[in-house]
Amino acid sequence: MPYDKPHARLPVTVLSGFLGAGKTTLLNHVLANREGLRVAVIVNDMSEVNIDAALVRGGEAALSRTEERLVEMTNGCICCTLRDDLLEEVDRLAREGRFDHLLIESSGISEPMPVAATFAFARDDGATLGDVAELDTMVTVVDAANFLPELAGGDELAERGLAPYEDDERTVSDLLVDQVEFADVIVLNKLDLVDSRAADGLRATLARLNPLARIVAATHGRVDLRQVLGTRLFDLERAQQAPGWVRELNGDHVPETEEYGISSTVFRSELPFHPGRLWTFVTEELDGGAFGRVLRSKGFFTLAGRSQVTGLWSQAGSVARFEPSAVRDPEAPFAQELVLIGVQLNADRIQTALTNCLMRPGERPPDVDPFPAWDTYGSDDFCAPEQQTGHAPTPVDLLDTVRTREDAQVQAV
């Protein structure tokens, strides 16, 4: 069935996914089966020689000069250094009025949220991309064979030579979770490389990480065009509420998938954490296997001795980050609100362990706090450091053995 153009503004689909997941293969498939659509394409690759663009040109989807236009963006990733270029290219393509849809294939190391934010970015004249183009669908392509092993690892992008800027301290697991949690559609690709039970378990994991996303099965990037174009699924407010940890905190519990052992638990308390005991839990116990395999945990926490600040807790795979989030509201009912998602979780043990990390009646804050000081930038309303600097603080690597507090690999800005 031909795709009807229902928008006055140019609808945009953004393809995200880690390197090798199959974004370009999916892009080739869409272009080869576009059913008469006039499609403009923006591709972005990290290398000086744009490999992804070369694959699109040389693949089975021949680009017609009269129907498609390919725009290459090199020397950076969409989410950071090339945002101005992205603004200009999307604006130009939209104003030409010659295309039914725009596909943006982001770099394998790009997070989708900043790409979406680009559409609301106001220029000097007050105009935004949203005036001429409309985000239609955020698509994340997942490699069925490698997603869980990569999520469990603690590799930094820099260790693989993938960091787009010098002080980028993001990890592969950070990126994978960000890409999944902000998706409207998750294309589960390369299913021919895993058995049916592994595929079902991965689906359950993805559904737990992002309960609102559509999960589309694919082999060699082959999907129905209508699954990724013209879905009208993207909504910023909905996207911000899509991650499983947010829905759990809001009371929208995702049904347990006991068959695959995927579950979650929510920890809440009005008491602050004892910094030393929490540090021990995070660096020595959380990834030790006694609680099951914790794939993702996130939420808000408070430390004794700095109770005026609410911290943001974010863990993906074997890496955890702790950073200031906001000045704590003294009227807030809870000091701790954490969600832990994983495989074969022992919820009772987790609850007991975290309870043991809380301050006890009559206990005073310790003189030694192993968490580095938080710089609140002198503001009563501040963002997490990654929002201000473009990258997150150095993580706690849960796979490393913490020998002393001084040499622990953590930095909270």
Label every PLM stretch briefly:
Residues A53, R83, M113-A116, S196-D200, ...:
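Conserved strand-to-helix beginnings and helix N-cap segments that scaffold or border functional pockets
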Residues P2-D174:
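Nucleotide-state-sensitive switch-loop elements of NTP-binding domains
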